[in-house]
Regions:
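Extreme N-terminal starter segment of soluble prokaryotic enzymes
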Residues: 1-4
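Charged helix-capping and loop-helix junction motifs
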Residues: 24, 110-115, 170-173
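Histidine-anchored nucleotide/phosphate-binding helix
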Residues: 34-35, 138-149
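Acidic/histidine-rich helix-loop elements
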Residues: 14-23
Length: 201
């Protein structure tokens, strides 16, 4: 059974947010359109969100944008909410991550019963996973790598992701490909880089 994992399509990761990725809003809308057309082909649709309460050194007034970041996706804030262009009506389960520490992979998240994503997927008979969301080179990358490591047949639909930077996106694509993740399409980047080449759609 195949499921769709939608990673961190939140206000703070889209234009106007505290850790915005250019193209985030476009990606949110594209995912909603994809769900309208293809959502019924998935046994389950799940989503993750950053949901920070007190993540310690993950937040910094002087972030290095590698290990520390500006405040973002604080639990209960508007920045932690899903972007309004992302229609969540098809989402079966929501997994929150990063409450008290840094968390990039959706597989570090749990649902409102405390069930981790990997266990939830297995319990629901899922063995294949498509991954989309924000950002290609950070949380999408981490989620796809964990999915493959856990034995899920994993595919990233790059046309429904957006990368922060061409260099780190290229590195993420290479790493995912080396881990056996199937890459379909091309990620959205603010400055399109023709060197970011993946399998054609």
């Amino acid at each position: 059974m195949r499921a769709l994992l939608i990673v961190d399509v939140q206000n703070d990761f889209c234009e106007g947010g505290s850790l915005a990725v250019e193209g985030g809003a476009t990606t949110a809308a594209a995912i909603s359109e994809y769900l309208t057309v293809e959502g019924a082909t998935y046994a389950h649709v799940v989503a993750s969100r950053d949901y920070h309460i007190d993540p310690g050194s993950h937040f910094s007034a002087r972030p290095d944008f590698s290990r520390s970041w500006p405040r973002h996706c604080v639990a209960g804030s508007s920045g932690a909410e899903f972007h309004p262009d992302f229609d969540t009506s098809a989402v079966d389960a929501l997994f929150s991550k990063g409450a008290h520490e840094a968390a990039y992979s959706a597989f570090e998240g749990t649902d409102d019963t405390g069930a981790p994503l990997g266990a939830w997927l297995r319990d629901h008979g899922v063995d294949e996973l498509d991954v989309v969301g924000i950002a290609t080179d950070y949380c999408v990358r981490a989620s796809a790598l964990d999915a493959a490591k856990l034995g899920f047949v994993t595919r990233v639909l790059l046309g429904l992701t957006v990368g922060v930077d061409p260099r780190t996106t290229r590195e993420a694509l290479d790493e995912m490909r080396a881990a056996g993740v199937e890459l379909a399409g091309r990620p959205l980047l603010e400055d399109h880089d023709e060197d970011v080449v993946t399998q054609p759609e």
